[in-house]
Regions:
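Glycine-rich cofactor/substrate-binding loops
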Residues: 1-36, 97-98, 279-435
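Short runs of predominantly hydrophobic/aromatic residues within well-ordered alpha helices
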Residues: 37, 84, 88, 234-237, ...
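A helix-coil-helix interface module used to build multimeric assemblies
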Residues: 1-201, 206-213, 274-275, 286, ...
Length: 435
């Protein structure tokens, strides 16, 4: 069945059909396509555009088709152009002419646009639920190792002492903002394009508010060209997916480092690690590495769809068929990563003694040493210089600030006294900063 037959005197070449088809991508929207058609048919009957009898046949036929697809009794034909064509063709074959009346006052342009919004309306809560699950896993890990001291880094150099809870808390805050981005995008997306027609609405006396309400939208899109021709809602969700995956990638990068012998701050559970085919000693953080890699894939989905949309004139263009490949892949990848990483993090064991040992090295308390001199009245820049000289002295003599005799301190600046040792104690450094 071709929805656009009549104008053409030849059958489309098989290569044309194959290239034009989107059934492999959009078949997942069969439920949403049926939901949209039920709302549309019910509205047509309520407005007297089709008969109640035809409407009843349409609704019953669509319900049967849905049940048969779900049960596996009806297989979606992979040679059909798209899911919309398949369902309408199947409906017409079952109920006859009544099925041909379903598309009255509707175009595939607004049909596709409402289907994808309906699908994503259901998909977004799945993603936000998984984000909340990852937040819970991170929060549990932060509480488990709340008082574990570790180095804080800048430029991947040891900078100042912090707690593990503070470090993980940064990712929790990032993920909470990610939640907000998905929720905001879902709110802006929640308006129905149904009734926009091909681009200029329809001459039939349809009720767009009725179908919008029936489908759970907050309202309908007032400009019909906008309704069928923009995919900013897909772009916005892909933007949220991309930022989320950047945060996930950064977290995974740190987990990968922490699990290395060079850091040895953490160890992943065997159930969430892999080995090597040749090196018996290896325990690889493959899940974290894969998630880090998949961040590029999701960012690519966003860049691809942005590039597709940037040069399109109003209204609908076939280029926009690429929207579903991008948004479905982006959302699917995000869900897959969150599903895999949450239990990996929940079962991850930290190694506090190694973290504490690392925090004790690298003169990580030098800023606190300088602040001690400031508390004695020395200007910060002078205190900074004096502490830098102390660090150089320690490096030359192979000692630490904690081990350096007070006489050596006083040789650099006479304002030093025994209180400096309390000031540079790691626990005190962390406590004073409220970390």
């Amino acid at each position: 069945m071709k929805l656009w037959a009549g104008r053409f005197s030849k059958e489309a070449d098989k290569k044309t059909n194959d290239f034009n088809s989107s059934i492999k991508t959009d078949s997942r929207m069969f439920n949403e396509d049926i939901d949209g058609s039920i709302a549309h048919a019910s509205m047509l009957a309520a407005k007297g555009i089709i008969s109640e009898e035809d409407c009843k046949k349409i609704l019953a036929g669509l319900s049967d088709i849905r049940n048969d697809i779900i049960s596996g009794e009806l297989m979606i034909d992979p040679d059909t152009e798209d899911i919309h064509t398949f369902i309408e063709g199947e409906l017409t074959s079952r109920i006859g002419d009544a099925g041909k009346r379903l598309h009255t006052g509707r175009s595939r342009n607004d049909q596709v646009a409402v289907d994808i919004r309906l699908y994503l309306k259901k998909d977004v809560p799945q993603v936000t639920g998984l984000i909340n699950g990852l937040i819970d896993a991170l929060d549990g890990k932060a509480k488990e190792y709340a008082h574990c001291i570790m180095p804080g880094y800048t430029h991947l150099q040891r900078a100042q002492p912090i707690t593990f809870a503070a470090h993980i808390g940064a990712y929790i805050e990032m993920l909470r903002r990610d939640l907000g981005r998905f929720e905001d995008a879902a709110g802006r997306m929640n308006y129905s394009p149904l009734g926009s027609g091909a681009l200029a609405g329809t001459t039939y006396p349809i009720d767009r508010a009725m179908t919008a309400k029936a489908l759970g939208f907050d309202g309908y899109m007032p400009n019909t060209l906008d309704g069928v021709s923009d995919r900013d809602f897909c772009l916005e969700l892909l933007g949220a997916c991309s930022i989320l995956m950047v945060h996930i990638s950064r977290l995974c990068e740190e987990i990968i480092m922490w699990c290395s012998w060079e850091f040895k701050f953490a160890e992943l559970d065997d159930a969430f690690s892999t080995g090597s085919s040749i090196m018996p000693q290896k325990k690889n953080p493959d899940l974290a590495e894969l998630a880090r890699g998949k961040a590029g894939r999701v960012i690519g989905d966003l860049c691809g769809l942005l590039t597709t949309m940037k040069g399109l004139p109003l209204a609908y263009n076939k280029d926009m068929q690429e929207d579903k490949d991008a948004i479905f892949d982006g959302m699917d990848t995000v869900k897959m990563c969150l599903t895999a990483l949450t239990p990996m993090i929940a079962t991850m064991k930290m190694i506090p003694e190694n973290m504490r040992k690392a925090a004790a090295g690298g003169f990580i308390n030098a800023t606190d040493c300088a602040d001690f001199l400031v508390s004695k009245g020395l200007p910060f820049r002078d205190a900074y210089k004096a502490t830098g000289e102390l660090v150089a002295l320690c490096i030359k003599s192979g000692t630490t600030l904690e081990e350096l005799p007070i006489d050596e301190y006083k040789s650099i600046c006479p304002l030093f006294d025994e209180g400096v040792y309390d000031a540079i104690n790691l626990e005190n450094c962390v406590t004073r900063r409220g970390m």
